[in-house]
Regions:
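Structural motif
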Residues: 3-20, 106
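A short, solvent-exposed loop/turn motif at the edges and junctions
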Residues: 28, 42, 50-87
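Envelope-exposed proteins and targeting segments
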Residues: 22, 29, 97-99
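Short, acidic Ser/Thr/Gly-rich low-complexity loop/linker segments typical of extracellular
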Residues: 12-20, 27-40, 44
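Exposed beta-strand and adjacent loop surfaces of beta-rich binding modules
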Residues: 21-25, 48-50, 111
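A short, amphipathic beta-strand motif
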Residues: 1-6, 39, 101
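N-terminal active-site segment of His-dependent metallophosphoesterases
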Residues: 83-85, 90-161
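Beta-strand signatures of extracellular beta-sandwich domains
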Residues: 3, 25-27
């Protein structure tokens, strides 16, 4: 349970004067629910869940210091199994009382440009550098692009990359 709300002051906390946003979809990866008139939603949360908001038009999710959108909450009270080859998720502890999603108002465009990469799969740091320096760096200067996205197999077999 939680709220999707207009975080007017962009402090990532639902203050008393900030109102919920109705009609926003939230999912647990299995089910999708819609927020009510107050921005409230209810959805089942297992002990291995990722709860996420589906960004509506004219709204933006917060971004972190790496410019990555913050639109989800991982709930794994015990974390990932210790016998995994790669680290996985640290224990998150008990489920919070509310899982709230702040959104910021923005003027959405009907038409926009985006850049999509499919399956870059570098297998070494040298290949990561090649991809960054010879491909991504060329696209940074492209005008009018709203966002970029990498899909599919992002790295080869070494997830530490």
């Amino acid at each position: 349970m939680g709220y999707v709300y207009n975080d007017v002051n962009e402090n990532l906390s639902m203050d008393k004067n900030e109102i919920g946003i109705s009609g926003v979809y939230v999912s647990n990866g299995v089910e999708i629910v819609k927020t009510d008139k107050d921005g409230k939603y209810k959805i089942p949360v297992s002990d291995d869940a990722i709860i996420f908001v589906i960004k509506p038009r004219n709204w933006m999710t917060p971004i972190n210091n790496l410019n990555l959108p913050q639109f989800y909450y991982i709930h794994k009270p015990n974390g990932s199994p210790s016998n995994f080859t790669f680290k996985g998720v640290d224990p998150t502890g008990p489920l919070p009382r509310n899982i709230n999603f702040p959104l910021y108002a923005e003027n959405g465009k009907s038409n926009f440009k985006m850049i999509v990469f499919g399956d870059p799969q570098p297998y070494s740091l040298e290949e990561v550098d090649f991809f960054s320096e010879n491909i991504v760096s060329e696209l940074v200067a492209v005008k009018g692009v709203e966002f970029g996205m990498t899909m599919g197999d992002i790295v080869g077999d070494n997830l530490d990359l």
